[in-house]
Amino acid sequence: MNRRYTREEYLEKANIIRKYMPHAGLTTDIIVGFPGESEEDFQDSMRIVREVGFSRIHVFKYSKRKNTKAAVMKNQIDGKVKKERSEKLIALGEEYQEIFEKENMKTPQSVLFEEDHEGEYYGYTTNYIRVKAKSQIDLKNKIKSVKILDTGEIANCEIIGD
């Protein structure tokens, strides 16, 4: 896909980030079913997700677009195969997202609360975990220290300290 870096270079950079920022949220987008993608290529994508331990991945299936080089490439991938691969990668991503969130439940997190809906305030930790907290006071546009209570698409948290 014309990437200007190797797998090894990518892993090296991820390891440097992890060395200096162990709880950094590393995210990625992954296309499955790009023309010519072999089962071995797909399995390597799965291995990279495991090796890096991404906090979140966005998976999408390649779709043919007119007037692109990829549209006329040989070895187009069957839709059923793309669907199966996408489902496997999404499940793996969710597994690693939960691991990441559980690891971050151990330490206080700073959150900028940006939205409110009927006494629930929503924001992101500094390492991109989406959280919500109930509060009687207005938290909108405030940074607060929180304890994450659970995992999920939007994790529940409680305000700690002031």
What are the language-model segments listed below?
Residues 72-162:
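Terminal RNA-binding accessory module
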Residues 20, 60, 92-96:
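Short hydrophobic alpha-helical module
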Residues 1-56, 62, 67-81:
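Conserved non-cysteine loop/helix-boundary elements of the Radical SAM core domain that shape
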